[in-house]
Amino acid sequence: MTSRGEKVQAAGLTEVPALTPGPARKPAAALAVRAGLVALAAAVLFFCYWRQSQAVPLSSDGSSNVLQAWAMLHGNLLLHNWWVSDVSFYTTELPQYMLIEALAGLGPWVVHAAAAMTYTLLVLLAAVLAAGGRPPGTPRSFFRGDPSPRTPLGKGYPPPRTPRALLAAGLMLSPQLGATSILLLSPDHTGTAVPLLVIWLLIDRARPHWYVPVMVGLLFTVTMVGDSIILLTGIVPLVLVGAGRAAAGLIRRGKRDASTWYELGMAGAAAGAGVAGSFGPRVMAALGGYRQSPIAADTDLSQLQHGAWVTFQGFLELFGANVFKPTFFGTRPALEVVFVAIHLAGAILAVWALGVGLARIFRPGELIVPVFAVAIVANLGAYMISTHAQDLLGAREMAALLPLGAVLAGRLLGDRIATWTRAARRWFVPVISVLTAGYLAALGFGAAQAPVPAGGEPLAGWLAAHGLTRGLASYWQANSTTVASSGHVVVSAVVPDVRDHLVPYLWESDLASYDPARHFANFVVADGPSVWPGMQLSAQLTFGHPARAYHVDGYTILVWNTNVLAKLDKSA
């Protein structure tokens, strides 16, 4: 037999090189096994994240989104009469909530299941995106179908992609308990990273053609309608890098090749999406849909030093490595302290990958690397000078840093770490094994936490037992109580106005629920944990002296024999 590439000679013929066989296709059985393993891993991850999510009580924020999805599921697709917050999540989490509610009904479990689903998707998408770019093949020109001499979005396609995927998934594998409310609970920008990674899978894997930027622009626009944070995490970084690299290429080579036009097309599509998406709230209101609360100016340069420190801690918190948290050396269990220390390795790798990515901004090659690096820097900078940088809970505004950093680390460092593992097996393999075991143990530790009831569950149970099925309360006792009761008790949010009279709270509320012609409400949760100051006095000024008053579990519940909605000032 002739060896691969060996010349052969037939009688009467000149020597020709033997044909080189193409790469063998993976058998269907092997692909099925691989798909089964991925499905099993996804199921295990979903279960662990679902369990950890239940360790944090559901509040009115997530409950409001549950009720909005419930309204959409029952025909109010545009959320007519609804006032949403400054982020609607209309095209991101709400469709997901509708799907879960169609299968499981209305209740607190919707948020926990959705959070687990979202984070599982993020881990899997980060692994796939970190694994590698567009498959090999002859690239095409952006405007024509002509072959291009250069690969627009990346040079080469390294075969060993598993280390990259494992590293990216590993860095996200086990969110620490302190970050559960950010990463594994209500919609708070974490879920917006799912469509972001999907968009980048399209950019990274699709062959360059004119319709790819068009699809990218449409996806960015749809995502921005739901959450404008995509401006910082995807749109602005792509515009800056695309335009910057095009300008640098023009200066360096004096002409625009297919790669330059393609990246400019991506940047233009992203810029157009940013403009179009900004009109989303106004378009929805004009169509008779929800009205969105305006996004307040949140820049505060007077606390820059404090903001920088909180930003640094927030970055560590997202990666599960915040050793500067006040409870680190104190009230935390010793095991949790160990997990946080182990997660420092992941945070260090993310910072290392960020530095490598920034150094490649103007280097021809993968577009995803400099864009993700710029996105991380933009998010850190915007958060640092914002009013959100007051405490660690505000780190939800930069939750996308975790998947972005994980993808960068896997993409840029996965092969290098695999090489080190082979070269220094004696000492490097034990280090990797300890870190892997630590991350897996942290995943199990989070899943082992005891579930806690939803925030409004005790109050909802008492109200239902006493026949009080519709009433008013402060924001934090309103929608959370409604969802905790699976809709059997409906509590609408009110707030004192300048006259100390109660008026509807135009934040995550359905104005139809205040209509006295359609509903009868006869109680107010007037005092208790997180209740607006002065609620009891405002309730009596608005509705008169109550017929009965109850004091239950720290709450004061005032009851009237009349419909209090009739006296509620809805003009305010």
Model-derived features: where do they sit?
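Membrane-proximal lumenal/periplasmic loop motifs of glycosylation machinery
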Residues: 52-60, 74-95, 108-109
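Signature aromatic-anchored transmembrane alpha helix within multi-pass, membrane-resident enzymes
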Residues: 30-41, 413-449
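Short hydrophobic/aromatic helix or loop-helix immediately within or flanking a transmembrane segment
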Residues: 64-70, 83-106, 313-329
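Transmembrane-helix motifs of polytopic, lipid-linked glycan transferases
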Residues: 38, 113-157, 198, 348-352
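Hydrophobic/aromatic-rich transmembrane helices and adjacent perimembrane loops
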Residues: 188-195, 232, 334-349, 365-420
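Membrane-interface alpha helices of multi-pass inner-membrane proteins
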Residues: 212-239
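Membrane-interface micro-motifs in multi-pass membrane enzymes
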Residues: 58, 86, 90, 157-204, ...
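Membrane-interface transmembrane helices that cradle and orient dolichyl/undecaprenyl
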Residues: 17, 138, 146-148, 153-155, ...
